[in-house]
């Protein structure tokens, strides 16, 4: 079906929220509830792990147009019109909406992203993995301006780019908090626990995004996303560490001037802007208080200790499905770390190992199946690496650090 962003006759925009029970989804519903004159929820989709939250959302919004991926969870709730692995995609295809917020986690968001673009609805994209994995496939499906980013960094870039024309842009600068391990050495990272990796210093996010931020993989994904969204070459996309997370991104222009977007860390601001784009939502978040003394720090990223960003850049330059390989390898390695099967440095070590062997995937995808094949290959390769490292760890229980040394070997490959 063909949708538009004209909204209802009363001017309200009809919004479908995918990933409604997650961090971004719950905050988006708060923004919508606070602005009933601007937005109306017309569909919800969730995995099914947080049924109490979903039931509460159904009661609060009155929405019965709901998708749940987990079949058993859908049966427990009852009266769920869309259920199963393709539930979110079918919900998008069958719902008249002006905006689809894709806040699903991981590359499983690819088909819903493509479905949303096909309907003509504006895609408020928090699920960066679908763009990273789909790459040119997603870009070909989108009309100009149809994708509006939800990530704070890309929302900031979109705002800053209003200050000049495309040919006036010299470079884009993404900021990174540095995560919970800023300033740590490679040796320090050998002993990181999932609990430590789940404690972000400035942002409140879901567990996978928090872990990806700790490893700096999230920033690597954002570099790829920046290139795809704004068409700027990788060698003109910089990353700088800014621990306070007040400046979210900057654009430097050819005359030497730099425009930055600043606001306290609150995802409701970029969420509200993506929902209402190009109009802002009054009172979406608190503004900076310049009457209170503060200092903003900037420092270079230590790419030796945190090589994930440079690996992402290499995958992006290689092109084709290599960014899908990067993302899929990370998803498998991150899950293994959270399960206690590998050490923290091994996450990026496995990504490096998989990319090193992935030359065959440096071709542009023609179909979704091409992307899925690349991801399947990367997952299987990563799983073999995890199994090998776990075997080394078991065989070397009397030799602490053996698994970590194996991870370092992979990282250098």
Swiss-Prot record:
Reactions mediated catalytically: 2-C-methyl-D-erythritol 4-phosphate + NADP(+) = 1-deoxy-D-xylulose 5-phosphate + NADPH + H(+)
E.C. code: 1.1.1.267
Gene3D superfamilies referenced in this protein's UniProt entry, alphabetically: 1.10.1740.10, NAD(P)-binding Rossmann-like Domain
Listed name of the protein: 1-deoxy-D-xylulose 5-phosphate reductoisomerase
Function of the protein: Catalyzes the NADPH-dependent rearrangement and reduction of 1-deoxy-D-xylulose-5-phosphate (DXP) to 2-C-methyl-D-erythritol 4-phosphate (MEP).
Residues that hold NADPH according to the record: 21-24, 47, 127, 129, 206
Assigned protein family: Belongs to the DXR family.
Pathway of action: Isoprenoid biosynthesis; isopentenyl diphosphate biosynthesis via DXP pathway; isopentenyl diphosphate from 1-deoxy-D-xylulose 5-phosphate: step 1/6
Organism: Mycobacterium tuberculosis (strain ATCC 25618 / H37Rv)
Binding-site positions, 1-deoxy-D-xylulose 5-phosphate: 128, 152-153, 177, 200, 213, 218-219, 222
Residues annotated for Mn(2+) binding in this entry: 151, 153, 222
Keywords: Isoprene biosynthesis, Manganese, Metal-binding, NADP, Oxidoreductase
Required cofactor(s): Mg(2+); Mn(2+)
Top-level taxonomic group: Bacteria
GO molecular function terms attached to this record: 1-deoxy-D-xylulose-5-phosphate reductoisomerase activity; cobalt ion binding; magnesium ion binding; manganese ion binding; NADPH binding
One GO term of the biological process aspect: terpenoid biosynthetic process, mevalonate-independent
